[in-house]
Amino acid sequence: MSHFYDLAPKDKDGNPFPFSNLKGKVVLVVNTASKCGFTPQYKGLEALYQKYKDRGFIILGFPCNQFGNQEPGSDEEIAQFCQKNYGVTFPVLAKINVNGDNVDPVYQFLKSQKKQLGLERIKWNFEKFLVNRQGQVIERYSSISKPEHLENDIESVL
């Protein structure tokens, strides 16, 4: 894939979710898990989404079970967990791999655009990538970066 907008991962129902529909939006992409110490970040992510969604901001959650088997549920179970426990209204897409031989093209692209400490691989759940309105990956945040600490960067590209 040569461009962010060429990507089309699957949503939780198995339907394509074409990133071409995101043109002109600021996008925060996050690999998520329901049984992780960072899972409470869902609350902060939802707060960011509510604060900025009317200004062209969207968050995409990608569940992943590659770190400590902390996302064992089905796509439907994951979506229900997010809504019930954290009131998540931003899109939570189908479970994917973010590293390894079966890495999803979304993460293959994101990691190639922004390395973390010189490394491409995702180190843990809740790493975040900020994509500007032109589809360029402008920042990558580690798992320990709390959603509220991203506000200045989000504001700067809205």
Swiss-Prot record:
Q: What is its main location?
A: cytoplasm
Give the enzyme class. oxidoreductase
Q: Which residues form the active site?
A: 36
**Matching Pfam families, A to Z?**
GSHPx
Entry's induction text? By oxidative, osmo- and heat stress.
Gene Ontology cellular component list: cytoplasm; cytosol; mitochondrion; nucleus
Which cysteines are cross-linked by disulfides?
Answer: 36-82
Keyword Iron-sulfur in annotation:
no
Keywords (alphabetical) are:
Antioxidant, Cytoplasm, Disulfide bond, Mitochondrion, Oxidoreductase, Peroxidase, Redox-active center, Stress response
Q: Where in the cell is it found?
A: Cytoplasm; Mitochondrion
Q: Look up the further comments and give them.
A: The active site is a conserved redox-active cysteine residue, the peroxidatic cysteine (C(P)), which makes the nucleophilic attack on the peroxide substrate. The peroxide oxidizes the C(P)-SH to cysteine sulfenic acid (C(P)-SOH), which then reacts with another cysteine residue, the resolving cysteine (C(R)), to form a disulfide bridge. The disulfide is subsequently reduced by an appropriate electron donor to complete the catalytic cycle. In this atypical 2-Cys peroxiredoxin, C(R) is present in the same subunit to form an intramolecular disulfide.
Under the subunit heading, UniProt states:
Monomer.
Q: Could you identify this protein by its name?
A: Glutathione peroxidase-like peroxiredoxin gpx1
